Amino acid sequence: RVFEFTNRGDFAHEIFGELVKWADKACPEMILGAGTVVDAGTASLYLQLGANFIVGPNFNPEIAPVCNRRLVPYSPGCGSVTEINNAQAAGCDVTKVFPAGNVGGPSFVKNVMAPLRWSNIMVTGAVEPTEENLTPWIKAGVLCVGMGSKLFPKETVAAGDWAAITAKCQEALGYIAKARA
């Protein structure tokens, strides 16, 4: 299991610190990282709190060495071939195309993969847990996808309907496996 905690709002880092402690006991197999990290200072803070990876909505070359020194993956948001190439040169093994739906969709990823076939691309933004949405992304060559509110609807979370969320996750994983077959 991989889970990205969104760094948004006052005291988000404090919540993350408590989440890391809880996950260590309740879900020791979970890989927990911090997202929406836009500067090196914030990356350092989350690394000290136990983040296993850092994700950003943009590529900030100052974050890469902070993560590289600790051998922690940094996945920056990129919206062009140049940004993806620069992120890879800075040591980022997985780049995030964000916002994927606005950047050009699956055709953008497919076109990037032609000259940069070694790229590991994660897409977020406009990714939905449906077969119609996931299949084109997987066929375009993405390594993985990121989903938030479409996978964890607010009303379902508020109702504590964890069975529905589990079912939606399993369904999405099934679509991904089918697209990769």
Residue ranges and their predicted role:
Residues 1-5, 30-36, 54-55, 74-77, ...:
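Hydrophobic faces of well-ordered beta-strands that scaffold small-molecule active sites
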Residues 5-24, 40-44, 54-88, 99-117, ...:
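Active-site-adjacent beta->alpha loops and helix N-cap segments on the catalytic face
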Residues 26-28, 70, 179:
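Helix C-cap/helix->beta junction micro-motif
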Residues 125-131, 149-151:
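Glycine-rich beta-alpha junction loops
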Residues 135-149:
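Short glycine/proline-rich, acidic loop/turn segments that cap or connect secondary-structure elements
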